[in-house]
From Swiss-Prot:
Stretches assigned to the F-box domain: 178-225
Protein known as: Putative F-box/LRR-repeat protein 23
LRR repeat feature ranges: 14-37, 39-64, 261-286, 287-311, 312-337, 344-367, 369-394, 401-427
PANTHER family for this protein: F-BOX DOMAIN CONTAINING PROTEIN, EXPRESSED, F-BOX_LRR-REPEAT PROTEIN 21-RELATED
């Protein structure tokens, strides 16, 4: 009998969206013998890649992989190569992730994420259904099993060469003596989960099981916060500012590094600064609501800061001087694509002069699209004697000729000139991501239990 469903429903999500996991398997796991991709969205092309690279594969489960079309040469190749082949339309009756489950959904159907009922029955059932077998990208991995739930992969069991070296693989598979990931040591679990972003941890990973939830609440998990919404439009459905505040609270003052794209505000960076006296790295990219005064005020509370990146924010020379005086250890400054609303050459050089006067310890300076002139550049070279990396791309008021050109090339180890390509810049200048935010965020979702 299906567990009782609470009437309250959270948003619905599509199960399968990506084809990159099979490619990663093909590229990094040549020793695979057993591969289960139950309900995966891989295509024929990715299946070919797996067959090309996983040359020892003998068991392949493709049930509910409805993007696969096993016909012609591909069908022949699979049948000849794979000893135990489960096809997309084969029965799932023997699978613990049977498509008839009240929570599991097959094909392109929507997936319902229900809230807990009063006695917790549904929570236990859902936790059981969404835990799956998975292995990390290790060349010695023999057994790998993926079952997709929402857009997140939940691991449960793993077997690698270290655990199989003294046990014949078929015997081990028969007895199902695989490691339960919920029983892994906390340090190892933490090491694995740290590879996820904050969104994945708060929205998914901490809800897998109680041991993972405990690890996800540990302050050591929040030394670095990167709520990366650059290439994921789905991320904008969340209240990212509230999510960021919650992540900062979990750090308990231990936050070292944070990067914010689009959703930063003066209030948010002040909230971070008030609770993160050990902060050493702060990135604010395309956070249009912030002001130079707001950044300077927040930065004054984090004197250990060594790295600061701000883009699309107009800075006055005085605000930059305040930052330099507040952060004597500042080694890297990225001040990119400031709005060009100043018109005189002296105004263009205000930032350069402030940097030269207040940031003598700089090693890395990036000024993409800045309006400084040769005079401002000379001031920086005079005032920042340790400068090794200087990025002047799209600084078209600079004329690198004669003595100035010679001085730059002799002094600067890594020099990017005004006309150099900026294709590799990572300041969001060509990112077309939507800059409006949703609010599908519930603080209780993060605490869970």
């Amino acid at each position: 009998m299906a567990p009782h469903r609470s009437r309250q429903r959270n948003p619905r999500f599509k199960l399968w969206r990506y084809d990159d996991e099979p490619l990663a398997i093909a590229e990094t796991m040549p020793e695979l013998r057993h591969l289960k991709l139950f309900g995966n969205g891989l295509t024929n092309l990715r299946l070919e890649a797996i067959l090309d690279n996983c040359v020892h594969l003998v068991h392949l489960d493709l049930r509910r992989c409805f993007n696969i079309n096993l016909l012609g040469d591909l069908e022949k190749r699979c049948s000849e190569r794979i000893r135990d082949l489960r096809r997309p339309d084969d029965s799932t009756a023997d699978s613990p992730f049977d498509a008839s489950s009240d929570i599991y959904s097959a094909g392109e159907d929507d997936y319902d994420f229900y809230s807990d009922d009063s006695d917790g029955t549904l929570s236990d059932h859902f936790e059981e259904c969404k835990t799956v077998s998975v292995a990390t990208g290790n060349e010695s991995v023999y057994v790998l099993s993926f079952v997709r739930s929402d857009n997140f992969i939940y691991p449960k069991k793993i077997a690698s060469s270290s655990s199989l070296s003294s046990t014949p693989l078929p015997s081990l598979m028969k007895d199902k003596k695989l490691r339960n990931w919920a029983e892994l040591p906390s340090k190892l679990t933490s090491s694995i989960l740290l590879r996820l972003g904050a969104i994945e941890i708060l929205q998914n990973a901490q809800k897998v099981c109680k041991p993972w939830h405990r690890v996800c609440k540990d302050p050591s998990m929040w030394r670095k916060i990167d709520i990366d919404n650059r290439n994921d439009r789905a991320a904008f459905k969340y209240d990212l500012e509230s999510m960021c505040r919650h992540a900062v609270d979990r750090s308990h003052g231990g936050l070292i590094e944070i990067e914010i794209w689009y959703y930063g505000t003066n209030d948010l960076i002040m909230y971070i600064a008030d609770r993160s006296s050990n902060l050493k790295s702060l990135g604010l990219v395309r956070c249009f609501p912030i002001t130079d005064e707001g950044v300077a005020k927040a930065v004054s509370k984090v004197p250990l800061l060594e790295y600061l990146e701000v883009s699309y924010c107009l800075f006055s020379g005085e605000s930059l001087r305040d930052i330099g005086r507040s952060c004597p250890n500042l080694k890297t400054l990225k001040l990119n694509r400031a709005p060009e609303i100043m018109f005189s050459n002296s105004g263009f050089d205000d930032n350069a002069k402030a940097i030269a006067e207040s940031m003598p310890e700089l090693r890395h300076l990036q000024l993409l699209g800045n309006g400084l002139t040769n005079k401002g550049l000379n001031a920086i070279l005079d005032g920042c004697p340790h400068l090794e990396h200087l990025d002047l791309r799209q600084c078209f008021n600079i004329n690198l000729v004669g003595d100035l050109k010679k001085r730059c090339f002799e002094r600067i180890k890594d020099l990017r000139c005004p006309n150099d390509s900026d294709d590799d810049s990572d300041d969001g200048s060509d990112n077309g991501a939507v800059t409006t935010f949703g609010s599908q965020f519930n603080e209780t979702d993060y605490h869970w239990y």
